């Protein structure tokens, strides 16, 4: 155990709960996601003072202490949490999907059959395991640090910071997509938005308006997400009904394995079916997260898959195939072919509003992640400051700045770069998930994936293989840029420790957070920069 060097010791709480039955398949685990275990006995809390001083976050099996009222342990009382079930489902929907806008490249890259198979198989291989991990660890650590705290408590604060850096950067890159998609859908009706100064001004204006919406608070964002979600999906429901008489099932079976752009195909599928863990950085704002978060994830998985397959089947089955036309924005053209100009304008309007929903949901996740990291002492304290609406102002401004810097990249470049960074972060999450199971098998888990440790390892084999494939298929340019970004994070954490030691910026730990390690004063001058 590391020497504390005169730091104040804190008592840690070991929470034990009854065991949960294990299942044998991922499908059974996914079904269980729909109902969090609410029949547990109240966990008993025993004080356990380490013999040689308290350990830093992530060492010696320190555990997260739950609230005594049965709510999943969190830094905020239930009365201060504002996000309920329905808004949470739509926030997850927009974190992950937002509708079928952007899935067109999967058909252009691989044809109808592989696109349909991809959106049926990848949710089982990737989305369900990621949602299950998020349900268990998000309920176990219901604070705004989310996956940063999962990794920090398992691997230590250095790797927790790396997780936060890669995931935040990936999220900001992801958010830079939405102005691009928004303008791609509008440029057929407003050609001036296709490039040049009008496009640049449109990106800046849109980013400013949506950033202001985030500033007004999660309650506003959540209910706006519901309204946008309903409006954005309605035209596809209508398009599917119009397409019924024109469907030719044989068109769904078209495949040409000799003409597949595997890199574009996998990156498009992966981008449209990941980011289930992003909602964890809002867990500190969710009402009764131990019950609400797993249920919301269950419903959101079904919601997302149906929202992709329904228009994909309608578009590929009712319109003769021209793979060259299947690029982002093509659903508006399909709507015009099937229903006329009125349906095309409706789809374009829905795309615009959907991108607004995805933007505000992603920015909420990114900005609250920075707040959560600051509350754990990983970032300067000004990131933890909240506006009068309870929102993280510094995190919002930093995230918006990143979006503006990256929004001039092309759609495909953005997708490939964010997927590369996201993969590294997911590998750390997988390791943290297994380590928590091995080191803390009896820790309180309001929701527990109904698999034993061996079953959890088996569940993670397919997604790990998928990550390897996505990384292997990345272009040299994307790999160099992404690895450069990773290297920046490796240097940035020691640099921040140096700044802390010099007292150039203030760092602090929120005392209201449950204890998962040492609450320490600023770094001592003789402390190593990297733990």
UniProtKB/Swiss-Prot annotation:
Pfam families: AA_permease_2
Renumbered residue ranges of the record's region Disordered: 1-76
GO MF term set: polyamine transmembrane transporter activity; symporter activity
Coiled-coil residues: none
Membrane as UniProt keyword: yes
UniProt-listed GO biological process terms: polyamine transport
Superkingdom, taxonomy of origin: Eukaryota
Protein name stated in the entry: Polyamine transporter PUT1
Organism: Oryza sativa subsp. japonica (Rice)
The encoding gene: PUT1
